Amino acid sequence: MGNFFNNGQRMPNIFERARAYEDGNKGYVQQQKPKTNIVVNTNRIGYGKKSTVSEFTAIAYDGTGNKIDSIKGYFLEPETNYNKAKVRNSDTSIEQGNYNVISKTELEKRINTERRKRGEEDIQLTYKWYVDSVPGRSGIAIHTGNYGKDTKGCFLPGENYSYDNATGTYNVWNSKKKTKELFDFFDNYGHNGIKINVNSK
């Protein structure tokens, strides 16, 4: 005979209890984020009077370090002058190096925690993704744009680029499309962190 509760209802057997546990935890399992991370490798390949162009490859890795996906494109930055790269508001490309890319939400939380300690009001950032802890600089973001005047140190993604002989400047094109592709890539695979390595050829 089976086991019964005091109210006369039959107690579920071990298989029924296991199934109920599994069903009850489906939402939890589905909400767990995959252990994937991203490395963005950039190489500066063109130096203009008012802008710098680099090629990038963003690579996604699984939890064991295996490459699972990648995308390519170009970044536009302002003019490169390494003597001013660490100078605040210098309107130049940042110094070469390895950085973390963090979300607007994460950076806002950190900034506003410090501001509250000083009795200051919270701020709201503009862009979705930021290059973190750049020496001497702040607010270095990844966002749309086509021309050198559109960036004060930020990275502007593009599908392709061109060089204007008359002005000596580089431009990137189809920026909105490439930015969306890159941000979708970040959202899909950047759960365990995003790094960007800024280099020159």
Question: Which residue stretches match the model-derived regions?
Answer:
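Low-complexity, glycine/serine/proline-rich disordered segments
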Residues: M1-V39
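Cell wall/extracellular polymer interaction/catalysis modules
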Residues: G27-N171, K177-I194, S200-K201
